[in-house]
């Protein structure tokens, strides 16, 4: 299996919280300083954008409390607006001014929550980013309605940074290039958005990329030919994906290529997945020890953020900060940024990345685009649990392993606690409904069946 996993919200959240609280040294325990945020300038508009951007994809929920590793939280559907307001206020007061949302985030509720929180502040004090998330219904009428609804939900008359969402993917009826044409070209939506930019309703127009390199290259060729000027582009980048994204998943493109192509054209890069959905904050103990040996006072997550921030072509690096502890720790990494040395970059991209690659997990970032499953399965919850056990080093099917009985019981008991039995992997019928919805292009039915077979084997070896 040639797949490497991405930590998930519940598991990664716990890891980050533990890391924030247990780090040695006063730097990680003090409140982040005010007035020290590092900013990057948009070369076209001269916007001063905070190097840390707030990703509004995993907002705090009512009753969520402190996440417990490997467990799904109750009350996931209800966003805790009071906590969102508090965290947005804290972020703004510490210099964060870029807020990234989308119509599909938080099961359609993120834009409203984001708009509610930001409406209480002066509009010129922040930059709003949202997206044309017309993955399911991409007629002109449905797409323009989505755009207008974003303005309504965000309670604004203009969008600072607007993106074509998830270009490069495919669906049951379209190959990647065909889907790009259907979603944005044939229906006239790109022309519509270009007109909105002329009118000032959109201030900067770009796209976010997942998937087929040919589509990425095609969109940049449009820029080169003068057909469309892309003001910015959002890509996945971190010290693991820099050279290993394609090895992790053959559908992915190495970040070094994506970033390099943008640099050639002077297009600012907005970074998503700097932590691989939390994966680079939830590292195995041997890897953590190596990071702590070099900088005991720094959190594990700070290495990943400093890596992204050390690239001069990065406009902002997005982080989905569910908990206040996440926000505070990330602020310490950017207030101000202390760039990595060239030697540290090489170490992260090379030896450390290769060690992380040896932990073979599933590349799920818990985005929940695959949900709801028509048969009621908790797909991301199943992957969350599996990845957590892998990262703990407790996954084994070797009967001769002296820890086998302990690890076997741990997996089965924690699986039943994390995911209700009726929603577990053994109920997957392989319908494929989820396949075109996954931006990571995971073969979800295959992975569900693999986990189901593994669990059956554990149960048989009682």
Report each predicted region and the residues it spans.
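Short Fe-S-cluster ligation motifs
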Residues: 392-431, 460-462
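Beta/alpha (TIM)-barrel catalytic core signal, keyed to glycine-rich beta->alpha loops juxtaposed to Asp/Glu
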Residues: 34-36, 167-384, 391-409, 436, ...
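N-terminal binding-site loop/beta-alpha segment at the start of enzyme catalytic domains
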Residues: 2-126, 157, 192, 198
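Short, acidic/polar
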Residues: 75-91, 139-154, 212-222, 300-305
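Active-site mouth loops of central-metabolism enzymes
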Residues: 58-81, 131-141, 211, 288-295
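A short, structured active-site edge motif that brings together acidic residues
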Residues: 124-136, 162-165, 235-237
